[in-house]
């Protein structure tokens, strides 16, 4: 979501004296309230970190679940993650990492009895055998799974290939805590950085004005014991970047992964867990081209994917072009939507984007599965949403598109266009698909829904709600 994240907005500054006294400078009333909550969360997480021992992080061994993969007993962690103030500022999940091989067999042993459960992604329809408190199943070639038992914190399984081959010749972060210079890890060109499992980078990661950079491994980028607001893993004006395998744990307001004016970026098998306001998952901005996401678990408090262009004056108007995401799972809190293009789109064009096989396993507040809220002047065109599956029962919001001025618009407003949008093989319990063009010269047109199911049935032409500044929005079954 863009409303709090434009460069035009101020961030508050936290000064820490002796690790205990905080002075907040230049805050609005809302920011003071949020900061007070963050301070409480930070103090609690810091106290927790002193008792965990193994990773010096807000992670303790889970007593709720055991996980056995191919007869290998995994470490299962109970993680405390950042959350909205109205949810107490924190939430617990249980996590385990595993290395995927074909035909992987999984056994989950729960600490107490249960009746109902959901294993996501549902689209795989994996046969599960339940024997008392045990669940067993064999997984296909997919890497992320979520087990939800009513009334309990979920179990999240994060799989990936073996990355050990990247270690040779790399800058290695061994298991343990590592601190960036002034809280930032600035990565350099022509280097591979390897995160051993159990390695924790305590600070933000900045990949800026560099090329040929790899950050790979099963460690964590984690500021939960010392949260600092702002975007967390940043790829700016860089080319030929690989991000693979690691976990992202941000404990303050800010997008978890953000990219601007970067190209030829490959992101796979990340696991993100941050559930506060403006904790978008995987975000792209102006000038991003040939960026590819795959097999990522996106635990977010705001938009799962947020692709936009927030500041033409600072970032230019190079098109957001030819970017793709596939086989990712979204586990989202009660702000934002599953997939968002917008709302700030201060660039020349946004085009040739594809989202395929995206599973929205949780969307707490019933937000739209897909939204293109267009508040600026870009030509938005040639976008495909294929195999988007919103598993949220009782959701009433499927698709939203509009072209209009709102709080995220550039002060000098110019309307844009939306055209050539395709929805293929999508599923949602919601039926509402709403379209609002701006005027006869700035329309929403040529939108197709093919083999889409809503509310447990085939989508109908009558499900489309559109104003007079739209054209050729069709449903085909």
Task: Pin down the residues of each PLM region.
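N-terminal secretory signal peptides that target proteins for export/translocation
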Residues: 1-10
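Bacterial Sec-dependent N-terminal signal peptides
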Residues: 15, 23-38
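Sec-dependent signal peptide recognition
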Residues: 9-17
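Extracellular/periplasmic carbohydrate-active domains that bind, remodel
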Residues: 34-477
């Amino acid at each position: 979501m863009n409303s709090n994240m434009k460069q035009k907005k101020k961030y508050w500054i936290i000064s820490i004296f002796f690790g205990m006294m905080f002075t907040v400078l230049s805050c609005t009333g809302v920011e003071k309230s949020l900061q007070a909550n963050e301070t409480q969360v930070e103090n609690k997480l810091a106290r927790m970190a002193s008792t965990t021992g193994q990773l010096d992080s807000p992670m303790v061994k889970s007593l709720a679940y055991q996980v056995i993969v191919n007869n290998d007993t995994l470490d299962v962690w109970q993680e405390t993650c950042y959350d909205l103030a109205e949810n107490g500022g924190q939430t617990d999940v249980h996590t385990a990492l595993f290395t995927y091989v074909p035909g992987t067999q999984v056994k989950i042993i729960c600490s107490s009895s249960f009746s109902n459960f959901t294993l996501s992604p549902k689209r795989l329809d994996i046969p599960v055998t339940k024997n008392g408190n045990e669940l067993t199943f064999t997984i296909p070639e997919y890497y992320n799974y979520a087990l939800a038992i009513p009334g309990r914190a979920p179990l999240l399984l994060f799989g990936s290939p073996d990355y050990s081959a990247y270690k040779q010749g790399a800058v290695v972060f061994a298991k343990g805590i590592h601190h960036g210079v002034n809280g930032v890890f600035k990565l350099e060109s022509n280097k591979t950085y390897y995160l051993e499992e159990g390695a924790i980078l305590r600070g933000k990661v900045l990949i800026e004005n560099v090329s040929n950079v790899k950050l790979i491994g099963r460690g964590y980028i984690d500021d939960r014991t010392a949260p600092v607001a702002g975007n967390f893993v940043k790829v700016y004006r860089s080319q030929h970047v690989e991000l693979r395998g690691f976990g992202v744990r941000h404990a303050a307001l800010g997008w978890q992964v953000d990219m601007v004016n970067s190209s030829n970026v490959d992101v796979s098998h990340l696991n993100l867990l941050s559930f506060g306001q403006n904790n978008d998952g995987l975000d792209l901005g102006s000038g991003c081209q040939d960026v590819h996401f795959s097999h990522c678990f996106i635990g977010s408090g705001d938009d799962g994917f947020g692709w936009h262009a927030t500041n033409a004056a600072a970032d230019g108007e190079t098109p957001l072009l030819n970017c793709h995401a596939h086989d990712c799972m979204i586990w989202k809190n009660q702000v934002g939507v599953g997939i968002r293009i917008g709302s700030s789109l201060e660039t020349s064009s946004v085009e040739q984007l594809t989202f395929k096989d995206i599973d929205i396993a949780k969307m707490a507040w019933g937000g739209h599965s897909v939204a293109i809220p267009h508040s600026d002047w870009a030509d938005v065109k040639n976008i495909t949403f294929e195999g988007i599956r919103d598993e949220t029962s009782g959701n009433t919001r499927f698709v939203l598109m509009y072209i209009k001025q709102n709080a995220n618009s550039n002060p000098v407003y110019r309307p844009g266009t939306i055209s050539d949008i395709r929805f293929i093989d999508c599923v949602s319990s919601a039926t509402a698909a709403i379209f609002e063009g701006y005027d006869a010269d700035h329309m929403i047109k040529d939108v197709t829904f093919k083999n889409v199911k809503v509310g447990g049935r085939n989508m109908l032409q009558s499900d489309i709600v559109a104003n007079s500044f739209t054209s050729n929005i069709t449903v085909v079954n």
